[in-house]
């Protein structure tokens, strides 16, 4: 099994998979009579159909035991999905390019600094939320509508990957 190298989460490195949601280096302007700075259009919510709706949820995720064997990835073919950390804890992101199935050799891993969120583009393969230190809360923006919006792919044993944030 291949051990994934964990990269720092940057807009440039993550661009093939979606948006990094962060204030550093983002467009902004003052509103509310100069008392509030708006960081504008940090990500775009994607939906497949006009009748689909963007919804906001909170996911409470328990920390996973590490190192972790990455056995599966999922994708959302009908809409984007954003995860914004609410408690400021670093978390991991595992992704693979859009395609009929994820290719084990193209899987990449990133570490958020806890102030960065991610918005997975439609169809991007990704691991479910990966909290590493303790229970964490995430604001999640995704799609509600008809149709199956979650495909799962399980790797054969020889294509499984190891994720070790402490290495």
From Swiss-Prot:
Pfam families: Ureidogly_lyase
Family membership: Belongs to the ureidoglycolate lyase family.
Subunit structure: Homodimer.
Gene Ontology biological-process entries: allantoin catabolic process; purine nucleobase catabolic process
Catalytic activity as recorded in UniProt: (S)-ureidoglycolate = urea + glyoxylate
Main enzyme class: lyase
Record-listed E.C. numbers: 4.3.2.3
Presence of keyword Lyase: yes
Function: Catalyzes the catabolism of the allantoin degradation intermediate (S)-ureidoglycolate, generating urea and glyoxylate. Involved in the utilization of allantoin as nitrogen source.
Cofactor(s), names only, from the UniProt record: Ni(2+)
First and last residue of the signal peptide: none
Database matches in InterPro entries: RmlC_Cupin_sf, UAH_cupin, Ureidogly_lyase, Ureidogly_lyase_bac, Ureidoglycolate_lyase_dom_sf
UniProt keyword annotations, A-Z: Lyase, Purine metabolism
Pathway(s) per entry: Nitrogen metabolism; (S)-allantoin degradation
Protein name: Ureidoglycolate lyase
PANTHER family: UREIDOGLYCOLATE HYDROLASE (PTHR21221), UREIDOGLYCOLATE LYASE (PTHR21221:SF1)
Gene Ontology molecular functions: ureidoglycolate hydrolase activity; ureidoglycolate lyase activity
